Amino acid sequence: MSKSRFKKLAAAGAGVAVAATALIGANASPAFAAYDIKVGLTPINSVGAYQYAIDSGMFRKNGINVTQTIPFPAPPPSIAALASGAVDFTYAPSIAIINAYANAGMALKVIAPADGYDMASLIKSKTNPAVAAGLDDTGVCVSPTSGINSWKDLTGKTVAVPARKTQGEVTIANAVKKDGGNAASINWVTLGFPQMVDAVKSGKVDAAFVVSPFTSDCTTAGQKILGYPGVAFFTNELAIGLWVTTADYAAKNPATVLAFQKSIAQANAFAMASKANMRKVILASTKLTGSTPAEALAANSPVYPKTVTKIDLQNPASKMLALGYLTKPLDTAGLLYTQYRGR
């Protein structure tokens, strides 16, 4: 894993000041594209479908010119960049979006799925650890000598997450609570994904939230995966990672949003059509993550849902309320933009 490259990408995104021609995924083809857009994301394996949509010309064919792809170390700063107008669209998990919508008052619209689960595997993952390990691209890394062998063992421990009150923290808190532990006693600290495994190995933290391609780094470094908090949290929600824009941008640029939705739908469908196609999409992700082809292919393959439903937003919001991450019930209907249903 090229951690130095990830750090450079994240640092560039934090400043939101990178020339378009120097950016990953930059694409200038005005002869085909009518709409210029800037896109934010966290460089993880599942954004490979987005990169493939650039590489294959799907965006261009649908009238989109991706002028900038700006990487961020975690979803909250990318959502902040979205709100400021520094990017037009960004990748973020449902929990991070709900937190920004409910607790920060950001007017957002979820326009397309970016990654998630298939229902059959999600159901099996509840009782089959092997299925969970193969499905969830997130995990919690701990030292094999730490004495941490169950979720409740994280009670009172120091746990690293990429950002507070988003997917890592919320899903781990849920797992700890369900296992009889006290999530409120956890000392949460923030670290970038490339620093997570080293922090566990050195004893700086007791546990760390990791996501592919960093999940495999945990075991490679002689540490162990405690469990998979994503599949422990989500029950029948299939779209977990999402593409989002602001309500204002969506209202003023419906044709651009539709073209973006169409491009993402085509890339997602391509990836899910065959193993050969998925391989191409996974390899495209290395342009964003800096991982080697071997590292990317060794990680869990992403799942790309066809659409986002109200369940994908309402259920996490209800669980966040029960865990104390929301102060009052939230109707997420206003978050969901009309989904693209074509090809």
Where are the language model's segments positioned?
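Pocket-lining segment of extracytoplasmic ligand-binding domains
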Residues: 95, 184, 188-189, 194-282
